[in-house]
From Swiss-Prot:
Catalysed transformations (reactions): uridine(38/39/40) in tRNA = pseudouridine(38/39/40) in tRNA
Annotated active site: D51
Binding annotation for substrate: Y109
UniProt entry tagged with the keyword Isomerase: yes
BP GO terms, sorted: tRNA pseudouridine synthesis
Organism field: Methanothrix thermoacetophila (strain DSM 6194 / JCM 14653 / NBRC 101360 / PT)
Name recorded for this polypeptide: tRNA pseudouridine synthase A
GO MF term list: RNA binding; tRNA pseudouridine(38-40) synthase activity
Keywords per UniProt: Isomerase, tRNA processing
Protein purpose: Formation of pseudouridine at positions 38, 39 and 40 in the anticodon stem and loop of transfer RNAs.
Xref: InterPro entries: PsdUridine_synth_cat_dom_sf, PsdUridine_synth_TruA, PsdUridine_synth_TruA_a/b_dom, PsdUridine_synth_TruA_C, TruA/RsuA/RluB/E/F_N
EC numbers on record: 5.4.99.12
Length: 267
């Protein structure tokens, strides 16, 4: 039978999603876990690759497993075989023809940008020009097959953090990070709003800057033929882990801010 899982991970601890020899990747640790529950060769399909430093909340994978071993294909069993910073938290029995990659109707990414003085109205105006079907050549390292359709872009801010939600039928390499990089320059006044129209012209000789990977997260992937069952125990356990992690990172942020304050005192 075919099983689909929603998985999440903290990307700054991995060298990306895709398996690479000698490097710690999300695919490699997931493959090892699936091998141990009896998935042939640990093989699975995934909704999309994420680069080094990029996290996920709603990555989706699917795999085949013999029916007499399907009782092992549940989040809490698989999580016992995974590092604590990668976890499955929802499960669905998938139809025979389902593919986490090819059956996806849309994907949604969220980017968190610290920019307390950004002009949200300018950013939202520029973002509106990106919705629809365009050639995003200037928003990617790729130079072939660069036409994509963005369904929506929402931009909000809270306590100095600007949150970009971008939903599209599909993305090309670095597309979201370059969209954020371009919108940030517009928001801080280094570029006019109309600059986004220049970037949408594939003949423009310059591309958009790339925002750092750590602020990016794969939020969700949409399908028409799955009924997800969330694992309550996993969500409770992971919530405790994330609270501890958030406290640790908040404390480290305080350390860095104090270092910055003292260094600035010298000039």
């Amino acid at each position: 039978m075919k099983i689909a899982l929603k998985i999440a991970y903290l990307g700054d601890r991995y060298y990306g999603f895709q398996r690479q020899p000698g490097l710690r990747t999300v695919e490699s640790v997931m493959r090892d876990a699936l091998l141990r529950i009896g998935v042939a060769n640990g093989d699975f399909c995934y909704a999309g690759r994420t680069d080094r430093g990029v996290s996920a909340l709603g990555q989706v994978i699917d795999f085949w497993i013999e029916e007499d071993r399907a009782y092992l294909a549940f989040p809490r069993v698989i999580n016992s075989l995974l590092p604590s910073d990668v976890w499955a938290w929802a499960r669905a029995v998938a139809p025979v023809g389902f593919s986490a990659r090819w059956s996806a109707l849309w994907r949604e990414y969220r980017y968190f940008l610290f920019s307390p003085d950004i002009d949200l109205s300018a950013v939202r105006e520029a973002a509106g020009h990106l919705v629809g079907t365009h050639d995003f050549r200037n928003f990617s390292m790729s130079k072939v097959d660069t036409v994509r359709r963005i369904i929506s872009i929402d931009v909000n801010a809270h306590c100095g953090i600007v949150v970009f939600d971008v939903r599209a039928e599909g993305f090309i390499w670095n597309m979201v990070r370059r969209i954020v990089g371009a919108l940030e320059l517009i928001g801080i006044g280094e570029k006019p709003v109309d600059w986004i129209l220049e970037l949408l012209d594939p003949s423009t000789p310059h591309g958009a800057p790339t925002a750092p990977p750590e602020g990016l997260m794969l939020m969700d992937v949409g399908y028409s033929d799955l009924e997800w069952e969330e694992d309550r125990y996993t969500k409770q356990r992971v919530s405790r882990m994330l609270i501890s992690e958030a406290r640790r990172r908040a404390a480290m942020s305080g350390v860095i801010q104090e270092m910055l304050r003292r260094m600035r005192d010298t000039f």
